[in-house]
Amino acid sequence: MAALRMRIQLNGESFELPDGETVAALLARLDLAGRRVAVELNLDIVPRSQHADTTLNDGDNVEVVHAIGGG
């Protein structure tokens, strides 16, 4: 039996994930785990301390912004 899938909007693009994926798992999938990022879920900022406990749902809008050093 195939795993159920959901679609979210990630930085304005359609993105498919397994049902029940957390913000932390999404960041790991994007190779952003442990990096300095800001995550917005449906217009609300998700604190880093809540990434592992915040489950994504079908149709969610997620924006991920990561800091890039410069100077």
Language model: regions and residue ranges:
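Ubiquitin-like/PB1-type beta-grasp interaction modules and other compact soluble beta-rich domains
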Residues: 1-70
